[in-house]
Amino acid sequence: SQSDQPKKDDGTLTATAPATGQASNLTERNAQQRLIENLQKNFKTTNINVKVLEIKATEVPNIYWVNLEGMSPIYTTADGKYLIQGELIRLGDKTLHNVGEAFQSEISKKALASLKVEDLIVYPAKGKTKHVVYVFTDISCPYCHKLHEHMAEINAAGIEVRYIAWPRGDQFIPGMESVWCSADRKVAFDQAIAGAQLPPANCKNPVVDQYKLGQSIGVNGTPAIYN
């Protein structure tokens, strides 16, 4: 009989029969939208000028991962009243589990993919390129110096290195801009690493934008290496 035939799912949402899970997904989206609105309201009340880009539910009940414009991601409670800065770690396995790692990896990949190669300092691999790594660097950073000393052997191993400007403080911005404004950035970077004073920059450059991009994906020191 007709009643025995399986009913076609037309995607209609009802309060009583979320058979396909669409209704529960809609409820979750609505909850997340309310949370974004609550967060923005609370930020404004506290005189924090920041924009919420996206939020995602975590495996922890009532705890959400929040991606902010120009800032490192944070966590918040479901009511948007409490913020948690730093990593959220799950115990109980043989290794520690970073709850937000997958979310962070996703936005990092998108951010790095948005960079124009011509805005970077690129050290290509020797022979076949096996890997490409992105390095947020600063000419004043001692560990960046150490890494740079091994560039030839890194390239010889088939690894292409792409430097991104990340001045560690306002006082280091002019030096980084001088490198990025040079006709040959590699030569300028080598000279700056060696302690040379480069002439002041006088060009449109991506140094500050690259710094902000680094901040948005959680960079808080150099060298910060991503692949």
Residues covered by each model-derived region:
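Non-globular targeting/processing and membrane-anchoring segments
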Residues: 1-132, 212-221, 226-227
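Structural alpha/beta surface segment adjacent to cysteine/selenocysteine redox centers
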Residues: 124, 129-203, 215-220
